Amino acid sequence: MRCPYCGSEDTQVKDSRPAEDNTSIRRRRICPDCGGRFTTFERVQLRELMVIKKTGRKVPFDRDKLVRSFEVALRKRPVERDRIERAVSGIVRRLESSGETEISSEQIGLQVLEAMKSLDDVGFVRYASVYRDFSLAEDFEKVISEINAKIARDPLDR
């Protein structure tokens, strides 16, 4: 593994342990050349996924981009990073085990919306506003009224 600080090819693993519900390995590494310390994660990749964008263009699936979309929607919200990682890992697992090598960005967006519902209502509205391309205040009102109706039906399911 190349050192991100000095570019040396010779780094050493100091510590390895399971992470994220045993779906990845967290490794602490050190560079003998510059003394830099950094962390890497190793995950199983069942298959190479391609995302079909709305324009029809195909791009490789990027797990980090999925994490960033959660982080943007949940910015300044009381949602722990660990819960985001579990949601992302679940989505990736479902995508990889679907048997498909190409998946539409719409399908991914629907899975993110579903996961966001259980994480945070505000994050859900934020993500939905981008995913569903809200342009009017009524679009927000409709989603918020759906959330309020859900809360009224089952106030403990929050």
UniProtKB/Swiss-Prot annotation:
Cofactor: Zn(2+)
Keyword Repressor: yes
Key words of the record: ATP-binding, DNA-binding, Metal-binding, Nucleotide-binding, Repressor, Transcription, Transcription regulation, Zinc, Zinc-finger
Region (Disordered): 1-22
InterPro entries: ATP-cone_dom, NrdR-like_N, RNR_NrdR-like
Highest taxon in the source lineage: Bacteria
Domain ATP-cone: 49-139
Amino acid composition bias (Basic and acidic residues), ranges on this chain: 11-22
Bound cofactor: record note: Binds 1 zinc ion.
Keyword Zinc among record annotations: yes
Any Pfam family hit: Zn_ribbon_NrdR
GO MF terms, alphabetically ordered: ATP binding; DNA binding; zinc ion binding
GO biological process, one term: negative regulation of DNA-templated transcription
Zinc finger (unnamed) in chain: 3-34
Family to which this protein belongs: Belongs to the NrdR family.
Alphabetical list of NCBIfam families matching this protein: transcriptional regulator NrdR (TIGR00244)
Protein role: Negatively regulates transcription of bacterial ribonucleotide reductase nrd genes and operons by binding to NrdR-boxes.
Annotated protein name in UniProt: Transcriptional repressor NrdR
Native species: Rhizobium leguminosarum bv. trifolii (strain WSM2304)
Protein's gene: nrdR
